Structures are given as structure tokens and as C-alpha cells.
Amino acid sequence: MVGLAGGLTRSSAYPAREFWNEKKPSDWTADEIDLLLNKSPWAKDAAISYYGGQNGPLSSSLPGERRRSGNASSGTSPSAMSPAAWKAIIRWQSALPVREAMKAPPSPDIEKFYILNMVGDVPSVGATPDEDATQRAARFETLKQVTKLEHKGDEILLSRVEVAPKNDLSLAGTLFYFSRGLALRPEDKQAVFSTKLGPIDVKCKFTLRDMMYRGNLEL
């Protein structure tokens, strides 16, 4: 099941009883997994602002399928899309409940990085076929300058970016890697992801106290 939920408030976004703390992952239903991956403390709607400039890296493709019409293979140009069409979920891909929901295999990256996945109708930052190594490196340097994970005035800068392929549980997306060298704690209250992609600003706020899983802050 693949989903990309619309905007909801905290009171209606999460179930009254947080099933992820009440049930074993093996007992989660398909609907519960979809909720955890698309509308939960670890997966939130991004706030997207269109400013019409070109200050961030951009490729000519979209990372995921369009939900209502068209898809990444249709050749739809990002510049042809209405500003209102931009929509994305930011998912904390390295968080334990997300990995358990997706049955993700163990990875040494989990110990080293916070990994966030941007999924939805936004410009891709993936490599293009006609791009050489120098162009790819320059675009990544630009992306590093405009992408960060913030908490209490501190910034964790981008270490790496990769394309996340589509699977049975999620549309394709873009993975952003941030070093765990600056540890996040519940008392930090909030973590904010932000980036610029061509003509749009993307920002997503996570409330850390809501991201407790079986007694631990899971990021």
C-alpha cells in the first residue's frame, strides 16, 4: 500500500492510542503501517513555499509518482507545475519504528546518520543522465549549502544525498543524510528540516517528545 496523506492537525493526525507503542510490529495492520509512514510523529507534511527563483539544485524529473494524475515518467517539467501542486512528506527514515514498518535490513548508516526521506510532488535532486562528475559534485555542494537539520539554534549540515527507489510501501523519494555527531534529545523539543529545490523552499518541523518509541527517542 502506498499513501501520501493530506494535511491534518495533531488531534486528528495521530490515533488516540498510539498503536506503535501498544502492539508489536508484527501485529501492525496495513492501514496502521500506512499511517505510520505517511501521517505520524515520524512522517509529516512539509511546508512548501514557492518563490520562483533558482537558488537550489534541481533536476528535470520528479522523484515520485503524482498521486492524482500523471507520474514521473510522463516528462512533466517542474516549471510547468502550479505552485499549489507541490506537496511532500518528510519521513524520518532512520527511526526504528519506520524501519520496522518497512522491514528494512540492518545498515551501518543507521548508527552514523539521521536519514530523512522526502517523498512526494517536488523536484528531484537525483543525478541526470547527461550530468558529468564535476556537475554532480557542484550541484551537491549547492545542496549542502541550502539543506540543514536544526535544533535550538544548532545546525546539522548535509553529509550525503541519495535517491530512494519506489517500493510496495512508499513512493520514490530523496534520502538526506545528517551526521549523528550532534545528538538530538527530547528536551531539544523540536527538530526542523529545510532545503531549497529550484523555485521552492521546503521545511518540516518534528516534535521530538512525540517521537518516543517504547521509552526511547527514536530518530
What does each of the following model-derived ranges do?
Residues Y14-L219:
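PEST-like low-complexity, intrinsically disordered acidic/proline/serine-rich tracts
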Residues M1-Y14:
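N-terminal export signals
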